[in-house]
C-alpha cells in the first residue's frame, strides 16, 4: 500500500491518541491524513461499524480540541483491498496552536508532526504560534458610524442612568 510520513498516520483502531494526532496535523503547515483500521506497515485491517465510529470520531474532534475545528476535517470511508477503513482528512488550521482541551495550551496539549511521529511543542513554539494569531480587539474594529462623538456617548449613558466623568469613566 503506502507508508507513514509527516502527512500520513496509521492507527489499527480508534484509541485515546486520536486527539493528539489530529492536533499535530492541525498545527502542521500542510495538514495530514489519519487512517483508522490500517497497521503501521500500511496493511488494511478494517473497522467494524464504520458509521458509528465516524460519529464517535467527529464528536471527539469537535468536543476535545480547541480552537474550533469545524470545517477543518472530513471523515470518509475508504475501501483498501476490499476492506473498509476510515480516512480522516485534516487541514492545516488557521488559528494555531490547536490543543487538547483537557491539557490546555501546554506541551501536554499542543503537538506537531516531526517525521512520522507527533511530538509535544515546546513552550516557546506554543508562544510563537499564539502571538501570530490575529485577534479583533476593540482598537482594531472599525465602527460603521464614524460620526460619533464623546458628547453623544455621554448622552447615551445619561439616558441609561449612568454618568461619564471627565476621564470618560462610568460612575
Kindly give the residue locations of the regions a language model identified.
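Conserved N-terminal catalytic/coupling substructures associated with nucleotide/phosphate chemistry
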Residues: 1-171
Amino acid at each position: 500500500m503506502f507508508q507513514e510520513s509527516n502527512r500520513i498516520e496509521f492507527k489499527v483502531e480508534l484509541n485515546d491518541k486520536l486527539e493528539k494526532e489530529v492536533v499535530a496535523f492541525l498545527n502542521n503547515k500542510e495538514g495530514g491524513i489519519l487512517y483508522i483500521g490500517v497497521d503501521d506497515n500500511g496493511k488494511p485491517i478494517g473497522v467494524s461499524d464504520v458509521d458509528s465510529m465516524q460519529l464517535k470520531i467527529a464528536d471527539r474532534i469537535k468536543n476535545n480540541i480547541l480552537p474550533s475545528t469545524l470545517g477543518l476535517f472530513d471523515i470518509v470511508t475508504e475501501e483498501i483491498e476490499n476492506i473498509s477503513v476510515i480516512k480522516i482528512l485534516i487541514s492545516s488550521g488557521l488559528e494555531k496552536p490547536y490543543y487538547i482541551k483537557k491539557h490546555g495550551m501546554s506541551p501536554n496539549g499542543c503537538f506537531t508532526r516531526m517525521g512520522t511521529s507527533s511530538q509535544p511543542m515546546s513552550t516557546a513554539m506554543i508562544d510563537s504560534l499564539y502571538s501570530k494569531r490575529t485577534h479583533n480587539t476593540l482598537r482594531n474594529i472599525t465602527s460603521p458610524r464614524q460620526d460619533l462623538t464623546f458628547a453623544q456617548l455621554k448622552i447615551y449613558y445619561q439616558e441609561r442612568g449612568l454618568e461619564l466623568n471627565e476621564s470618560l469613566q462610568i460612575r
